[in-house]
């Protein structure tokens, strides 16, 4: 009791002190009345937390943590859970980009997305729909400028690209994604989604942009793309195989992929590729590639 009250009395509300207070305010091994004293102290000094995503993210993680454990003896009660949720609402950033930035993290601490209730596919779909809703809001409020800013600041570029594509793949949207100079992972997310949902439009974009390499390598390798690359001028073909990722491939292209990677001097990547194939338990003949 004395230690907790000393913490409250001496708190200078620096970032480190606030983190300590948040931990104490939800510590399951403390009596509820002591947690309440810390919670009241935080609520009385809320301006120190306002607009800081660091604390917003911390509170979201705690809400997620306790929502998953609602039936546990050590879980905080409904009143304390409501305190956390109300605190989060009160300190959210006013800036729309900062307020939505957390939705583009690699992991979304949202209690509605509990893994234990869903398989991985459904979990992934829920996360994507959550991000798409944020993209729609940003576009509605501030247009392409909002998408540009969230793309620049997002943690998970690939998932951001997927959300952009799920939102819309109109030609103005495609031109925006291509011309902004975004991260390659964002391009990969966007164009993999486009290729899987509208191949005809993907190929039209490839032709419109004169077989630009970043559009081609964004979807990795597959049989259809590999055949197309073979029709390109030698310099363009070499550029593709020098830069394409070995982490995105299809089983039907493994031989030609290994062969072409060796031709451009990527023997280390070939070994990495074959190790992953072997680890996956696939029986795929790749010996011809080493005889090229």
Predicted regions and their residues:
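Non-catalytic all-alpha helical scaffold/repeat segments
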Residues: 1-292
């Amino acid at each position: 009791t004395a230690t907790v009250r000393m913490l409250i009395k001496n708190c200078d509300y620096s970032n480190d002190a606030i983190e300590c207070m948040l931990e104490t305010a939800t510590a399951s091994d403390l009596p509820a009345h002591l947690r309440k004293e810390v919670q009241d102290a935080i609520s009385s000094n809320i301006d120190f937390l306002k607009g800081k995503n660091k604390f917003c993210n911390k509170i979201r993680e705690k809400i997620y943590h306790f929502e998953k454990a609602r039936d546990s003896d050590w879980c905080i009660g409904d009143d304390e859970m409501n305190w956390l949720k109300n605190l989060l609402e009160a300190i959210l950033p006013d800036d729309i980009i900062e307020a939505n930035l957390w939705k583009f993290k690699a992991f979304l601490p949202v209690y509605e997305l509990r893994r234990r209730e869903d398989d991985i596919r459904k979990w992934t779909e829920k996360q994507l729909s959550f991000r798409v809703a944020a993209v729609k809001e940003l576009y509605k409020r501030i247009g392409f400028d909002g998408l540009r800013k969230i793309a620049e600041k997002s943690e998970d570029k690939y998932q951001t690209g997927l959300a952009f594509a799920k939102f819309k793949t109109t030609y103005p949207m495609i031109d925006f994604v291509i011309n902004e100079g975004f991260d390659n992972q964002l391009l990969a997310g966007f164009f993999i989604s486009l290729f899987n949902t509208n191949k005809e439009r993907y190929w039209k974009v490839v032709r419109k942009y004169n077989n630009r390499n970043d559009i081609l390598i964004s979807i990795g390798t597959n049989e259809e793309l590999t055949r197309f690359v073979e029709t390109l001028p030698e310099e363009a073909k070499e550029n593709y195989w020098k830069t394409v990722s070995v982490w995105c491939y299809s089983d039907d292209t493994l031989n030609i992929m290994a062969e072409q990677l060796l031709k451009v001097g990527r023997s280390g990547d070939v070994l990495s590729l074959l190790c992953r194939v072997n680890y996956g338990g696939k029986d795929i003949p790749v010996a011809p590639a080493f005889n090229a």
